[in-house]
Structure formats: structure tokens, C-alpha cells
Amino acid sequence: MSAFLDKLSGSQCVSLEKCGDVVVSTNDCMIALYCHFCRDLFTQLPEFLRHLQGAHSDVLHFTKEHNVYSVEELMSGEQDDAQEDAHSAGHNSSSGDSRIPAKSEDSRAIDASEDNSDNSPVKSEQKGMQNEINLLAEVTNILLQSKEREHINNESKPENGGFNGPCKKASSESNSLRICDLKSHTIARTSRKRMSMLKNRILRVIDSDVSAKREMKPSEPNYILPITETIQEDNIPKICFETQPKPIPSSSNLSVRKSSLSEPNVSLACTNYAAKKTTLTIPKLLNCTPKSNLPCQQSQVYSDSNGRSETYHISKATSQGSKEMESFPVKITQIDVLPPLILPETSTTPNQKERVNALVENNTVNLYTAQNLPKEKPKKFFKKRGELWMKSEDSPSKSVKITKYRGNPIIVKRVQTSSAKSSPCKTQIRSNDKTKCFASEFNSTKIRKLKMENSIALKKEDPCSNKSIRLSKMATISSCEILKVVGLPAITDQKLEDTLLLDELETMRKKADQFSKIYKKYDSIWNYRKIFPPGKPEFISQKMFALTREVNETMGCNLANSAIKSIINQISVWHYNIYTKCIVLDTISETARHTLKLFSFLPVSFAYFCKCCDDIFTLNEDYTRHLVSQQARYQCTKCIKAFKYRGHFEKHLQNVHP
């Protein structure tokens, strides 16, 4: 390139002048042209050339005015190149497989050439070449259309010649159709078989249902079937009054032997009677001849054990107006064997039972209106609900006292003598319906439940209110004592310094000044939220240990790490409350102003440091929740370390303080 530029500069026709530099930005992948005259950047070459011609023509002395290509001219040149490429691609892609794409590319190239032919400043020779190209494109389109028609006609007519492709396809299609026909035939046959099987099953079920409905259920011994058919008069025999009347049954005939009514015999007799009545009387019901209303009727009971029958004669007596049954036939339908009675150990007389039942009924009826009665003082020993202790005839140690009030129901009171403690037997009677007996106590139990719920809710909020108050008082006392060591008791109790003497006040303020100077050095602790990124908990714990060591050495005290953390938390909370509550400085006491001046370097935002562990919290809610979870039951007196479990505390004593 340098040799080419030397040749151009060496000739007299060409004069080159350096107008700018090419600037490249690697981040944005952009190229720009830098103008030396006005120090501007241009992203496009035509803009840069127009700028030089318009703004710096006095320096450069352009000989020609229009020596810069316009955008339209550049686009027309690019379109001509595209047309030539498309035309060459169309000729190259004129094979049998790519007919349609070639056609589309040629048509697009022709359309583009026709559209841009008017605007492009091309010479006459180029126009002639374009006309020839257009003619060739039209001829190729006509040939392609004719070939497509022939191809469609050839596909519609099956060929028997040497072209094997379509024949194979046709044969494969026919084979596939035959296989499909076979499959459909087998599917239809199997489906017919399944449907016939289902049909047979359904018919069997229907037949079984019909036969089950036709079967008559066995009738009970007392059941009488209604006569549906009419009785013919010819079949009814005439009444013969010449027959001798049968004798009236005696009491011996009506009695039933106990031997014949044993449990297995009676059960068998009942079952046989029901079975025979259903099997024998049903088919003969329509053909039976009605008998006259004789004064006696017979009923037989069959038994399989001894094979003998017993007859029961029942007489009917007719009255003047209507016939009434004076005696009924003895029919045993069911015999149940009851379990043996379990009698209580204490014997009760019938008179005693009647008295007790009467008293219990009176108590259940009248306890509904007993709510307004004056309540007695509760005794030390209470009995269970629903228990009434009455006086028995055998044991004179117990007595019942019944008191009546005006317009009030009877109330049973229990009075026990001194000898009642020695008496071993007690009669205990419970009421059957406890809900009725103790309806008066329902409201009291409801109120008791509400009180219990309220107490449970209070326990959830504050599990031990008195204990928490005592602990809070102890915590304030301990925090005051810890703050006195540092000289800052005014944070918790502002009136405390008013009671001190001047010498004590001066010593306290000196201690506070010393502590503030030491604390100011550790900005990673008091400025935890402002530092970015914040320090790690391990680093801050190391700083906290260093702070405690320095405070103990300079101030001559023996404070633990947890005590220093509590002091820092109290100072930061006190400082935050003063600045957020918008307190006027004139209303604050002198001690508060003095402490504010000492800790003026503290920011408003702060962090909470846990006493038991190295966790740090920025929100008060999270800190309090963590404190509740970290409540310690055991604390070492030597190192003031807290432990939640006794085993951990004992291990600490064995390992650390042997």
C-alpha cells in the first residue's frame, strides 16, 4: 500500500493530502473517521467527504464540485452486482431437482432490473446486455413451464417403460393397502366376537334377574296370602249340620309342656313350621275348600326331634253386637337367650330404689331453674359430677339433707357424719342423662373455657408475666451496674446522676470520656452498616475481643465480651432514639448533652450484636427473635459464657475450667 501511495504522490496528476485518521472502537465494534481540521468523528465515508467539501474547501481547494457519490448511485451499483449474481445462480441451478428455486430467483432478478432500470445511469452497451439477459430469462421461464406440464401429465399416466421408480412406489402402495385390508378384517372379526360375548353375558344377567324376581320369598308364620282367583261355587261343599260338635277345650289342653319347649326343639319347630307352611299351603290355596265357621280351630306344630304333634284348641264366643276374641292362639315366633344379670355387690331394697329414683327425677327437672340460687363456698374436696350419695337403711353413717327455699326447687345436700370415714361401703348412683342434670353448670363451664382461652393467649404472648417483669427489673439493674463501670449510667436512668456527688460525677464522666475515645478507634464496629462491603462476622468478633481487652487494660475493669456487646447495643439504641424522636436539645438534661457530645461520631443507622454468638442483625425484630431462641439457662461465673443445656455447661467446666 505504501508503494502504491508513493506512485500516486510521485505523479503530477494526483495530489494527496492527509485530512483524517481511521479510529476503531473495540468495545462497540465501530469504525469512525477523525477530521484533523475540526476534530470531529464521522461513522460513514460519504458524510466525511461532504464535510470536507463543505467545511474545509478553502483549505483543500477542491477542483470539482460533485466528486462524491450519492447514496442512490451507490445503491444502484450494488443492485447491478446482485442482478448479475442472481442470473449466474439461475443458470447454474437449472437442474431437474432445483427448478422452482431457479425460476423464483430469475423472476426476482428480472423484477429488480425492471424497477431500477429507469433510475440507474447506465451506458447503452449495458442496456443492450440487460435486454439480452431479459430475453434469455423469458425463454427459460417458458421452457420451465412446459417441462412442468409434461411432468404433471407423466405422473397422472402410469408408465410401463424402463422408469422403475414410480412402478416400485405403486407396488409398495398396493401391498400396504392389502395389508391394511387384512388388518381391518381381523379387527372387525375380533370386535364381532367380543360384542357377541358381551351380548351373551348381558342376556344371562337379565335372565337371572327375571328368575330371581319370579322366586317367591318365604312367608312368615303369621303371613296370609290373598286369594287372587275366584272360588267356584261347585267346588264348595255344602255344610253338614249332622256332625257332632267337638268338646270344648279344657285348661289342660291349652297348657304347654315345658319339656317340649326346650331351646333346640322350639327353634326347630318354628323353622319347620314356617317351611312347611310355605311349601304346602301355597300351591293348594286356590283349590282348597272353605270351611264353615266352626267354634274350634286346630293348629299343629311339628317337631323333628320326637315326631309328635301338639294341638291347641281355641274357642270363639259370639257376642250380641260384635264378635270379640277372648283367647288367642299361642304362636312362638322367636326365642332369645338373654345373658345372665350382673347384679351390684351392694344390696338395695325396693323401697330405697323408689326413694332414690324419685329424688333423682326431682333433681333433673328442677336443676334448670337453680341458677339464681346463692352459691355456697367451695369445699376442699369435691366429688365427681353426676354422683348423688344417699342415705341407705343398712348404713346409718350417711344422711341426706333436703332444704327448701321459697319459690325455689328442692336441692339435695350431702351431710357426712364423723363415722362416715370409717364406713367402707358407699352407694353411688349416677343420673342417666348428664346433660339435663347439669344444665345449670353449662354457662359456668363456658365462662371457664373463655377464661382459659384468654389465659392461654396471654401465656403465648407473655409466658410468665410476673417472672418477665422481675427479669426485666433485674436486667435493668445489671445493665446499670455494667454501664457504671464504663461511666454511662445516664443512658438507662437519667435521674441517677442527679443523686450523685460532684466527685462521683467527675469520675463517671472521665470514665465515659475514656470509653468514647477507645470506642472511636473501632469504626468497623460502630460503622458496620456504612462500610461496603461489610466486615465478616469472624473479623468483627476479633475486633470485639480487641476492644474488650483494651477497655479492661485502660480502665482497670474485668468486663466480658458479652458485656461490651450489651453496652454497644444500648449506646446505639439510645443515640438512635434521641435523633429519631426529634427531641429539642434544650429539654435534654446536662448529662444527656454531655454523652451526646462524647458519641457525636456515631451514625444514626447501627447494627445489633448478639451476646451469646457472633451473629449480627440490622433489624430489631430479627434480633429479638434470635434472643428468644438463644435464651440460656446456665451461665459460667468465671468467663460469663451462657449455655442452653446442662450437658454443654458441664463439658465447658471440665474442659475450660478443670
UniProtKB/Swiss-Prot annotation:
Disordered: annotated span? 78-127, 151-175
Q: What is its main location?
A: nucleus
Query: Polar residues: which segments have biased composition?
Result: 118-127
What one GO molecular function would you report for this record? zinc ion binding
Keyword hit for Metal-binding: yes
Enumerate the subcellular locations listed in this protein's record, separating them with semicolons. Nucleus; Chromosome
Per the record, what is one GO cellular component? autosome
Where composition is biased (Basic and acidic residues), the residues are 100-111
Tell me which residue ranges form C2H2-type zinc fingers: 33-56, 608-630, 634-657
Q: Which domain of life is it from?
A: Eukaryota
Report the family membership. Belongs to the Teflon family.
Question: What does the UniProt function comment say about this protein?
Answer: Specifically required in males for proper segregation of autosomal bivalents at meiosis I. Expression is required in the male germ line prior to spermatocyte stage S4. May have a role as a bridging molecule maintaining adhesion to hold autosome bivalents together via heterochromatic connections.
Its name, as the record gives it, is Protein teflon
Question: What organism is this sequence from?
Answer: Drosophila erecta (Fruit fly)
